[in-house]
């Protein structure tokens, strides 16, 4: 008997697949960082726009955005605060799942409150993309390039 048999075609293909999967897995932290930076930019710039022209922002929340249960001024303030604070957490990778989850819900509220205009302008597609990325970050976490990872290593049970 041959102690060192030649790998079959399936064995070689499986080996190549495992090699490729291992190489791609090394890109995961960069992909998650890219997602965090992209989403942070989108929401932070939106928050800056709200703050720069506050009277127009309140007018939009009065006339266009229909946020249930909140006055337009309160809704505008909470919206701006969310869009300016949560992206900072995402960039740092600090409380990332909380920040991504919060922005995920915020994104849904924006679509519901502004759906008619978004569908007319095609903007709903952007919100679907953002929601998908935020869902990935909420479920998968920020990746290894994050303050959360350092904190988990230091303070997680059994570390």
Locate each region found by the language model:
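Extended, low-polarity transmembrane helix blocks
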Residues: 1-52, 69-81, 85, 92-159
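Residue-level detector of alpha-helical secondary structure
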Residues: 42-43, 56, 60
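Short juxtamembrane and helix-loop transition motifs at transmembrane-helix boundaries
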Residues: 58-68, 86-91
């Amino acid at each position: 008997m041959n102690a060192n048999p030649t790998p079959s075609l399936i064995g070689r293909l499986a080996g190549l697949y495992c090699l490729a999967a291992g190489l791609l897995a090394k890109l995961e932290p960069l992909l998650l960082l890219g997602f965090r930076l992209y989403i942070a930019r989108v929401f932070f710039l939106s928050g800056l726009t709200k703050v720069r022209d506050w009277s127009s922002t309140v007018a939009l929340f009065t006339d266009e955005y229909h946020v249930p249960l909140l006055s337009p001024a309160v809704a505008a303030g909470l919206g701006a605060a969310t869009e300016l604070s949560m992206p900072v957490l995402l960039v740092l990778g600090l409380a990332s799942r909380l920040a991504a989850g919060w922005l995920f819900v915020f994104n849904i509220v924006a679509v519901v409150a502004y759906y008619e205009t978004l569908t007319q302008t095609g903007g709903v597609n952007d919100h679907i993309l953002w929601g998908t990325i935020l869902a990935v970050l909420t479920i998968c976490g920020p990746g290894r390039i994050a303050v959360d990872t350092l904190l988990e290593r230091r303070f997680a049970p059994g570390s």
